[in-house]
Amino acid sequence: MLDELKCEACSIDAIALTTQQQQELLLELEGWHLMEREGIPQLEKVYKFKNFMQAWQFSNQVAELAEQEFHHPSILLEWGKVTVTWWSHSIKGLHKNDFICAAKCDQIIR
């Protein structure tokens, strides 16, 4: 299971996942989708909540996860929802770390 793995150091010379590898790992996640922004592949999910406070608390938990894994997403906090987007900045693409952290985000709300 992805949520049981730890992120590894991802240097600028790390190799980004192929499209096939991304698709295979995506099968292990629920509700996440692959997208591209400014030519950079990214992994994104929108989480829904009953109010702003719940969304804010979840955002803080994702921030704590990011610090623990030393891998940081884009987090968009809005009333009743949080959009989390993972990608590996150093390689301008997707790494297994992104899928590990996505799985750990899902674990937060279970």
From Swiss-Prot:
GO terms for biological process: tetrahydrobiopterin biosynthetic process. It catalyses: (4aS,6R)-4a-hydroxy-L-erythro-5,6,7,8-tetrahydrobiopterin = (6R)-L-erythro-6,7-dihydrobiopterin + H2O. Keywords: Lyase. The keyword Metal-binding does not apply. GO terms for molecular function: 4-alpha-hydroxytetrahydrobiopterin dehydratase activity. CDD domains: PCD_DCoH_subfamily_a. Its EC number is 4.2.1.96. The keyword Lyase applies. Gene3D superfamilies: Transcriptional coactivator/pterin dehydratase. InterPro entries: PCD_sf, Pterin-4-alpha-carb_dehyd, Pterin_deHydtase. Belongs to the pterin-4-alpha-carbinolamine dehydratase family. This is Putative pterin-4-alpha-carbinolamine dehydratase. It comes from Vibrio vulnificus (strain YJ016). The lineage of its organism: Bacteria, Pseudomonadati, Pseudomonadota, Gammaproteobacteria, Vibrionales.
